[in-house]
Structures are given as C-alpha cells and as structure tokens.
C-alpha cells in the first residue's frame, strides 16, 4: 500500500500483520545466528555453523566508502518500491549492521536488548504516542511516573514528590540536571540568562564528556568545566581536591554551581566517594548530581549496592537502563528527591499545549502514585532536602502533582521510553534484575582474573574491577613495551584483528599508550571471555611475532 485511497476502506491491520510476518522472517535468523555463534566465541575463532559454513555473525565489515557502494541507497522521487523494496532494504541493513546479540560484542557501554525489549519497541511503535501531556498519553504517563518513582526509591529518594522523568539519553539527562541546578540555585537565570555570573561546573577527570557538551549548550562554555583529579589506582574523585578547586573558583570571583559525581566511569568503571563529595557540596551550597548512567543498576544487587553508598544525598541522578540492563536504546531517567524542583526550573507558559496543571474534569482522574512495590529497600538513607530560596521551597511544598511531563523537561516531543523498563521489570522482577547484575559483575571479575593469571597481559583495572569493563595491556614476553606508541599500535592492531574472529572490543588512552577496554554485560557467558583471551593470545603472537 502506497497511500490512502478515499474510496476504499482502511485495511491497515492486515497490512501491518503481513509486513510483521515478512520482517519476522528476516530478524529471527539474524538473532539465531548470534545464538549459534556461541561455540565460536568460546573457541576464540570462527567455527562452522549448523549448515557447515564458516560465517562471522557479528559483522560483515566494510569500509565506509565500500558500504556506500554496497547499499546503493536510493530514496524514490516518484513511486515507492513497495514491500519488495522495503524488505530488501531491511535485509541489507541486517547484513551490514553489527549484531549486538552476538556474544562477541563487548565494545561499548551497552549491549543487545532481549526478547522483552523487542516487544516493548514494537508496542511503542504501534502506539506512536507523545508523552508530553497527559491527555494524549494517559496510560504511558502513569507508567512513567510510577516507574520513575519506584526507581528513585531504590536510590533513596523516598519523599512524597520523589521521582523523575525520562530524557533522550544520558547526555540529555545530564544537560537537564545542569539547567535545573542553575535555575534552582539562581532563579533569575531562567529569564535573564547567566548575566555576569561566571559559573563553574566540577566533574571528575574521568567523567563523561557530556558535562562539557552541556556547558557549551547552556552558554557557559567548555572552560566552565573544571576537572577534579582522581586517585591514581581506583580512578575515584579526590574530594579534598574538589574542595580546593571550589575555593579557588571563589577566590577568582567565579560562582561554583554544580558537581557531577560518577557511578561507573567510562573507562575504569569507578564509583566516586559520594558521601565525601556531598559534604563538600553541602559546605559550599553546590548542586550534587550523580551520573549513574552506567553503574547505577548496581542498586538492584545486594552484593554491589554498597558502591552507591551516599547516592541519596544527591539533588539529581541519571541512570540509563539501556546500558547495563539490556533495555533497548535509549532509556534514560533523570531522578531526584523532589520533582517539583524539576517543574519549577523548566516550566514555561504554552497555552496551546499545557491547558492546566492537572487533567481536565472530563478526563479520567489519574491514580495517586505511591511506592508500594516490593523492591528491596536501601537501609539508613533519606533524601537530600531541595536546594533553592526559602520561598521557592515553600511553593514546592504546596505544589500540585504535575501530569504533563514535558513541563518537567527541556523536551516537547517525548517518546515513552519508561515503558521499556516497566515491561522488563514486570517480566523479570527486581530479583531477576539482581541475578542479571550479579552475573555480569561475576563475568567481569572472571575476565580480570584470567588476564591477571597470564604473562601475556598486564591488568590496568582493579581485580575485581569496580564495574563491567576490564582494562589491560598486551605484554609481549611478560612486559609492557617502554614506547607508548608501540603499545598503542599493538593494541589497535589487535583490536582490528579480533573482528575477523568474531569479537569487538574497544581501547582507551593510558599512561603507557592505549590499552584494551572490554565491556561485558548481563548476557555475556564466562566461556565467551575465556574464548576472547584465547583469541588475544593468538593474535598477539601474530602482531608481535
């Protein structure tokens, strides 16, 4: 069907059914190929599949210019190509895309989704809702508020207006937190801009680059971001160094505003000392944000929850279920102890969209959101009180509950990303999440132990590592090369050669040149990392000779 014929009845349901069946015939073999490649990933080399063919299910690698030629993408300027053209394009996309379902994908801080994730994306596509106002997305609004409130409760945000909203990824959540911090601590900035203030944001030297991006976006400039030194071994922020930098900023006539602490840094996976950092923030009246995009889901695990000790002291917190929890990309929550603060910082009059602070009398009354789920509580924590002027805090205490969620964010168009976590939570339960998190951490520890036991490698990460990435150098003859450029060249060459064996891993710069950064996830098998080590040993001999 290439359009609507006003003289014929709609038959969209049958068309959707037919196309879903046709696409299903393409995507199921794609996923199955990854499942069938498990023996190859355990072996460290490609093995014949069930049909006797040797195939790299992870990726059919091409250079960009070659892929442009192979795809030969054309967007018809006249009549469309219909179902045949659609299915051929989908087939090509699958053929030339990285199969993140493959065990060998250990490259970035995310992995494949899972069967529930696929279903959730399908449902969102069918609904095609915009969760900006309650009127057009009633069920999804209730789900987002309840899911965010329950998730916030795990981090110790347990007040009556605790909760959060989803944003378009962790960078967007972090950006939104900075806007909220500025407009809360300095309300005049919402209408007058930054004026003559020279704000300073503080983040770990190992923190995510999104803080600098946000500073640029907010008109502060990247130079407004001051990086705080970390402990050389653990990679954790030095709270005493933070305090000194805050004092220096004040002495220079600047306005310290915001501290970004990290739960799971991008390279080493470090968890900053939140209690010590919170003490500095309290002393100087700074906004404390925790970027738990990567390491936040450890909160589900009794064994690893301690890494987030002090998270309840934050004024806001980012967590991305699409990273550690195999929820489809993107799914990012910005959480806090009081969402009235979010609303006051971001709300603007838009009478054509926001008709009232609560649903109209003709709309069904939304239920009161409470945290009655049977999640495991975090002991001895209570939420940080809101920051801001006394009269503003009083207004928050009297604020009505907000159901038009776009009014709490920088967005208008909002996809219902919370549904993806909600359905996964309903399917697996908090206990299932705990098992997944514990398994992933155990696999990371297993890989670190394998690396530490071999003379071919030198571990950079702690053993066990704090999060799910394991960092190490290749050490020919039991020794890392003195020349940094040699180490970098070896690492990059070995990473490239791994692809032909069915593995994708990353590398990062270090004191002795670039080293391997391998990221495992909740679906990674121990045999997979054992196979990876076998492959690295073999490739190392090829590269070094």
What are these regions (language model features)?
Residues 2-161, 502-504, 516, 532-536:
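N-terminal entrance/gating region of PLP-dependent enzymes' catalytic architecture
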Residues 139-140, 164-171, 203-204, 262:
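Active-site nucleophile and cofactor-binding loops and adjacent substrate-binding regions
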Residues 151-179, 226-229:
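Short loop-beta-helix segment that forms the pyridoxal 5′-phosphate
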Residues 160-161, 196, 462-468, 509-515:
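Short Gly/Ser/Thr- and Asp/Glu-enriched loop/turn motifs at secondary-structure junctions
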Residues 173, 179-343, 347, 360-362, ...:
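Conserved PLP-enzyme active-site core in the AAT-like
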Residues 265, 310-455, 462-463:
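Active-site C-terminal subdomain of aminotransferase-like
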Residues 389, 510-545:
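PLP-dependent enzyme catalytic core of the Aspartate aminotransferase-like
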Residues 459-497:
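Conserved PLP-binding catalytic core of the aspartate aminotransferase-like
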């Amino acid at each position: 069907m290439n359009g609507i014929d006003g003289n014929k009845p709609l038959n969209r349901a049958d068309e959707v059914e037919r196309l879903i069946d046709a696409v299903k015939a393409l995507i199921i073999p794609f996923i199955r190929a990854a499942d069938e490649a498990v023996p190859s990933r355990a072996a460290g080399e490609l093995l014949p599949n069930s049909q006797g063919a040797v195939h790299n299910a992870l990726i059919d690698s091409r250079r960009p210019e070659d892929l442009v030629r192979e795809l030969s993408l054309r967007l018809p300027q006249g009549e469309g190509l219909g179902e045949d053209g659609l299915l051929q394009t989908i087939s090509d996309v699958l053929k030339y895309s990285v199969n993140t379902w493959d065990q060998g994908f250990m490259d970035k801080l995310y992995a494949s989704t899972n069967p529930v994730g696929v279903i959730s994306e399908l449902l969102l596509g069918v609904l095609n809702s915009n969760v900006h106002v309650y009127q057009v997305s009633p069920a999804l609004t209730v789900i987002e508020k309840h899911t965010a409130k329950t998730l916030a409760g795990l981090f110790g945000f347990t007040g009556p207006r605790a909760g959060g909203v989803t944003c378009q990824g962790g960078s967007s959540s972090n950006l939104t937190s900075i806007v909220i911090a500025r407009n809360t601590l300095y309300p005049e900035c919402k209408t007058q801009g930054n004026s003559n203030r020279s704000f300073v944001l503080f983040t770990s030297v190992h923190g995510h680059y999104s803080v600098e991006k946000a500073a640029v976006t907010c008109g502060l400039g990247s130079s407004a971001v001051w990086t705080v030194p970390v402990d050389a071994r653990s990679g954790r922020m030095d709270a005493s160094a933070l305090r000194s930098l805050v004092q220096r900023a004040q002495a220079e006539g600047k306005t310290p505003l915001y501290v970004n602490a990290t739960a799971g840094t991008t390279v080493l996976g470090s968890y900053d000392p939140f209690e010590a950092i919170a003490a500095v923030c309290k002393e100087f009246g700074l906004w404390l944000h925790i970027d738990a995009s990567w390491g936040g889901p450890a909160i589900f695990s009794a064994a690893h929850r301690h890494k987030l000790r002090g998270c309840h002291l934050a004024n806001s917190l980012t967590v991305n279920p699409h990273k550690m929890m195999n929820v489809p990309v993107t799914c990012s929550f910005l959480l806090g102890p009081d969402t009235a603060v979010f609303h006051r910082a971001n709300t603007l009059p838009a009478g054509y969209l926001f008709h009232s602070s609560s649903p109209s009398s003709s709309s069904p009354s939304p239920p009161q959101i409470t945290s009655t789920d049977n999640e495991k509580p975090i002991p001895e924590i209570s939420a940080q009180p809101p920051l801001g002027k006394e009269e503003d805090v009083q207004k928050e205490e009297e604020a009505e509950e907000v159901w038009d969620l776009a009014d709490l964010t920088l967005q208008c168009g909002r996809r219902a990303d919370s549904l993806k976590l909600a359905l996964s939570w309903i399917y697996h339960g908090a206990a299932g999440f705990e098992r997944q998190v514990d398994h992933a951490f155990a696999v990371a520890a297993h890989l670190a132990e394998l690396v530490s036991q071999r003379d071919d490698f030198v571990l950079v990460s702690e053993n066990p590592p704090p999060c799910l990435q394991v960092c190490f150098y290749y050490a020919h003859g039991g020794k890392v090369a003195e020349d940094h450029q040699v180490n970098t060249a070896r690492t990059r060459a070995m990473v490239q050669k791994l692809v032909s064996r069915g593995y994708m891993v990353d590398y990062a710069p270090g004191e002795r040149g670039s080293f391997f950064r391998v990221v495992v996830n909740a679906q990674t098998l121990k045999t997979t990392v054992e196979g990876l080590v076998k492959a690295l040993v073999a490739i190392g001999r090829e590269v070094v000779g």
